[in-house]
């Protein structure tokens, strides 16, 4: 191995020997062909410089030789640099260098041999803190380093020291919900709600878990729609649409965010004409003024038109003039015309009003509260001095309608003058409530108007059966709570055939105090609070006694008759089978009536009892019909009663008809109007909506058919009697059939007709007749079918004889036993 300073020595010697060489050439000669990197030895040989060699060695004599660099680093290596170092050949020499990532402890860059090797790892991360660019994280390794990128970054393939941002939004590496959109940022991303959306309750706006929902700008008031338009929410946005009946202004388009609309000139004041046949100068003057308002109406002046109309109505009712001289019936017609006309005009003209609540007042007390609003999900309350109305907005806004809706409450205190002595029509159920006792008889009703008359109108014209009831709170004159006085919530009902009357249909009193009454109604019209005075006949205490005693006897007789037909085998045939089914149905119906007719505490139970009574009584009447049919067929086939087709026909028909027909009627009634089973005072059919005819209709039909059977039976028997021979048995059978036909008509329906005839002056008498005869129906049946039947009497005789014989044998056995006992006593003593 060579050292740094010794390498300089050959060079210096060469410089010193040059003059000598030149002299020697001159003297001894030197080869002129020596190649580069060599020196002349003599005239025939050359020597390669240190670090170079030729093929022949260090000294050569051929002019074709050249001196080439000796590669000390090999292969094979001529020197050893040691571990973590690399040999670097140089022209004429070499040096050792630490491998990349390593350096000498001295700080030098080269060394000559392994003994000088002090290479150790270089920490590039400390040496060059910014070796990893753009947020890269440097990690030192043996002899090198690596750059790692934080989340949201990745290494640049062109420069492994450079970290570049990952765009998660375009790469599909984000889990954002579809209700959000991805926003890329340096090193990450956000899930932000889309425009027009908002985070759902409990969800933040930005993190990966963000979930959004549409913002209803319309209901939240976060829209910029002009008052002439209606806000319509869309997914992520909204539109502004012209109100119903309006049109966009010039240079504007409908359904845009900046839409502005105007009222079209064709929105008209509806035609309103006076009632026909009414002669009144005061009314004529009023309608002349109405025609002026109609002629001058412009949608832009809707507010002024409504105010003028309210004032005109107010003045008419304050000073009615010659209207007061009209008969009450004609005054009622005028009131109906005013109420209906006002409702129509105000409904139409209000469509031109801007959104918002409005109030109109007149000097004499006529007031109008109006609300024009978009569709909402809230309660609406309109108030005046003496009345308040509360309803749900979905009642006002008809499904499918566009634009805002209108609801108005009009109070007309002066309308009571025209409605004086107006008739009051009470529902049957309200009549029962009036007199408080279901057995009392209502004699007469007179009414007094306590409150102002209010009218309700809305843009939705379908108001006959509202989805939810409307609540009214009336403040009125003090009501006297005495017997024979009752407060009612009423509305003004009119038709084409009559001018109108007060009615309670669909309205109920929720609460009533001395000066305030709360009502609920399922329809809209003109409403008021009436106090009705009535006379009630005192309840007759004798009728319940007759009912319970008579039904008790009937139950006993029905039970005896049923046991007779069930246990007596000798008399059983088709006729007795019909009798037995009739007796069972009547027995169960009377028993249920006695035990449960007043069980009204639990409404569901009361409805079930009413349905059971409905079924049992209808089944009784159906079996009565089959009795009449069988009697008619028997009379027609008098001579072959037991061998004709009558028996077979009745056996096939009686059970399906007897129990199937009433089942069908009750099933249809319960499916259509189940809520009408049971009243407040009785577990029977509610007379509302003519539901009672689901019982009376079949009863009347059966009675009519039985009457026909009776007449035809009499006609057949009459012809039989005229053609009979002297056969005594046939004559007796025919007479018995004639008697049964007469009794059948009386039992099978005539008594029930008396119940329908309980009206007018004879109602009290009819009530007694119906109660007595109907409650003793079981007694009549036992008398006709058992006691007056020779076969049954004979069977009863056999039973009694058997009972006496059994009793006699029992007594004989007892006496014999005693005699034997007396004989044995002395023997036992002995």
UniProtKB/Swiss-Prot annotation:
Location of this chain's protein in the cell: Cell membrane; Cell projection, Ruffle membrane
GO cellular component: leading edge membrane; plasma membrane; ruffle membrane
Domain GAIN-B: 358-537
Segments passing through the bilayer: 541-561, 577-597, 604-624, 652-672, 691-711, 745-765, 768-788
Topology Cytoplasmic: residue spans: 562-576, 625-651, 712-744, 789-830
Disulfide bonding pattern of the chain: 30-40, 34-46, 48-67, 73-87, 81-96, 125-138, 132-147, 169-182, 176-191, 218-231, 225-240, 489-519, 507-521
EGF-like domain segment(s): 26-68, 69-108, 121-159, 165-203, 214-253
Keywords: Autocatalytic cleavage, Calcium, Cell adhesion, Cell membrane, Cell projection, Disulfide bond, EGF-like domain, Glycoprotein, Inflammatory response, Membrane, Repeat, Signal, Transmembrane, Transmembrane helix
Residues of the site described as Cleavage: 524-525
GO molecular-function terms, A-Z: calcium ion binding; chondroitin sulfate binding; G protein-coupled receptor activity
Region of interest: GPS: 489-537
InterPro entries cross-referenced by the UniProt entry: EGF-like_Ca-bd_dom, EGF-like_dom, EGF-type_Asp/Asn_hydroxyl_site, EGF_Ca-bd_CS, GAIN_B, GAIN_dom_sf, GPCR_2-like_7TM, GPCR_2_ADGRE2_ADGRE5
Signal peptide segment: 1-22
Record flagged with keyword Glycoprotein: yes
Membrane topology (Extracellular): 23-540, 598-603, 673-690, 766-767
UniProt entry tagged with the keyword Ribosomal protein: no
Family: Belongs to the G-protein coupled receptor 2 family. Adhesion G-protein coupled receptor (ADGR) subfamily.
Entry's free-text remark on domains: The GPS region of the GAIN-B domain is necessary, but not sufficient for receptor cleavage, which require the entire extracellular stalk.
Name by which UniProt lists this protein: Adhesion G protein-coupled receptor E2
Organism ancestry: Eukaryota, Metazoa, Chordata, Craniata, Vertebrata
């Amino acid at each position: 191995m060579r050292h740094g300073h010794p390498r300089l020595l050959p060079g210096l010697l060469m410089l010193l020997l040059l003059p000598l060489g030149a002299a020697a050439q001159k003297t001894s000669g030197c080869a002129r062909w020596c190649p580069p990197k060599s020196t002349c030895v003599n005239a025939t040989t050359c020597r390669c410089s240190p670090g170079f060699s030729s093929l022949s060695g260090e000294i050569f004599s051929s002019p074709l030789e050249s001196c080439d660099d000796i590669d000390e680093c090999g292969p094979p290596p001529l020197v050893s640099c040691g571990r973590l170092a690399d040999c670097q050949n140089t022209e004429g020499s070499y040096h050792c260098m630490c491998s990349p990532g390593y350096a000498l402890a001295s700080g030098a860059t080269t060394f000559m041999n392994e003994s000088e090797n002090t290479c150790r790892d270089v920490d590039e991360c400390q040496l060059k803190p910014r070796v990893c660019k753009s947020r890269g994280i440097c990690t030192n390794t043996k002899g090198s380093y690596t750059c790692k990128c934080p989340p949201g970054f990745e290494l640049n393939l062109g420069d492994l020291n450079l970290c570049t941002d990952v765009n998660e939004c375009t790469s599909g590496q984000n889990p954002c919900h579809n209700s959000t959109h991805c926003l890329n940022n340096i090193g990450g991303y956000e899930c932000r709600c889309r425009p027009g959306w908002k985070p759902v309750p409990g969800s933040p706006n930005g993190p990966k878990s963000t979930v959004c929902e549409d913002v209803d700008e319309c209901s939240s008031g976060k829209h910029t729609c002009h008052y002439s338009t209606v806000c319509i929410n869309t997914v992520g946005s909204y539109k502004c649409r012209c109100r119903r009946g309006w049109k966009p202004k010039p240079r504007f388009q409908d359904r845009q965010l900046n839409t502005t609309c105007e009222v079209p000139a064709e929105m008209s004041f509806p035609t309103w004409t006076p009632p026909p046949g009414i002669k009144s100068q005061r009314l004529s003057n009023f309608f002349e003024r109405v025609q002026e308002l109609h002629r001058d109406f412009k949608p832009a002046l809707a507010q002024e038109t409504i105010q003028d109309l309210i004032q005109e109505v107010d003045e008419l009712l304050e000073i009615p003039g010659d209207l007061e001289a009209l008969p009450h019936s004609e005054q009622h017609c005028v009131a109906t015309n005013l109420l209906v006309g006002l409702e129509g005009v105000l409904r139409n003209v209000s469509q031109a009003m801007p959104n918002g609540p409005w109030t109109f007042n007149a000097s004499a007390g006529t007031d109008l509260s109006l609300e024009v609003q978009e569709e909402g999900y809230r309660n609406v309350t309109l108030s005046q001095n003496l009345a308040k109305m509360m309803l749900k907005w979905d009642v006002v806004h008809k499904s499918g309608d566009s634009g805002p809706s209108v609801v108005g409450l009009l109070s007309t205190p002066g309308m009571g003058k025209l409605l004086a002595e107006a008739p009051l029509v009470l529902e049957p159920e309200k009549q029962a409530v009036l007199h408080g006792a279901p057995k009392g008889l209502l004699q007469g009703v007179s009414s007094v108007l306590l409150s102002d008359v209010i009218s309700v109108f809305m843009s939705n014209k379908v108001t006959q059966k509202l989805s939810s009831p409307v609540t009214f709170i009336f403040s009125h004159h003090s009501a006297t709570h005495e017997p024979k006085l009752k407060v009612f919530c009423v509305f003004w009902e009119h038709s084409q055939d009559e001018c109108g009357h007060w009615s309670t249909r669909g309205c109920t009193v929720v609460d009533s105090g001395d000066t305030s009454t709360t009502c609920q109604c399922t329809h809209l019209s003109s409403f008021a609070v009436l106090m009705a005075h009535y006379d009630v006949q005192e309840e007759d205490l004798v009728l319940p006694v007759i009912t319970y005693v008579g039904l008790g006897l009937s139950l006993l007789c029905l039970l005896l008759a049923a046991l007779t037909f069930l246990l007596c085998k000798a008399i059983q045939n088709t006729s007795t089978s019909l009798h037995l089914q009739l007796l069972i149905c009547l027995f169960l119906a009377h028993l249920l009536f006695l035990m449960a007719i007043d069980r009204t505490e639990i409404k569901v139970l009361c409805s079930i009892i009413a349905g059971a009574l409905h079924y049992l009584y209808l089944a009784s009447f159906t079996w009565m019909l089959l009795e009449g049919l069988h009697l008619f067929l028997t009379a027609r086939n008098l001579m072959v009663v037991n061998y004709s087709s009558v028996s077979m026909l009745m056996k096939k028909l009686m059970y399906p008809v007897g129990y199937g027909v009433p089942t069908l009627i009750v099933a249809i009634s319960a499916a259509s109007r189940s809520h009408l089973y049971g009243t407040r005072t009785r577990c029977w059919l509610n007379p509302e909506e003519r539901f009672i005819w689901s019982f009376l209709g079949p009863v009347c039909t059966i009675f009519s058919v039985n009457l026909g059977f009776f007449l035809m039976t009499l006609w057949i028997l009459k012809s039989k009697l005229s053609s009979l021979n002297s056969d005594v048995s046939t004559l007796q059978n025919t007479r018995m059939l004639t008697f049964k036909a007469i009794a059948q008509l009386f039992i099978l329906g005539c008594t029930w007709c008396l119940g329908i005839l309980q009206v007018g002056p004879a109602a009290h008498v009819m009530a007694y007749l119906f109660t007595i005869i109907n409650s003793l129906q079981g007694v009549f049946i036992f008398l006709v079918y058992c006691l007056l039947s020779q076969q049954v009497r004979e069977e009863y005789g056999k039973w009694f004889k058997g009972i006496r014989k059994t009793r006699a044998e029992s007594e004989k056995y007892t006496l014999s036993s005693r005699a034997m006992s007396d004989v044995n006593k002395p023997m036992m003593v002995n």
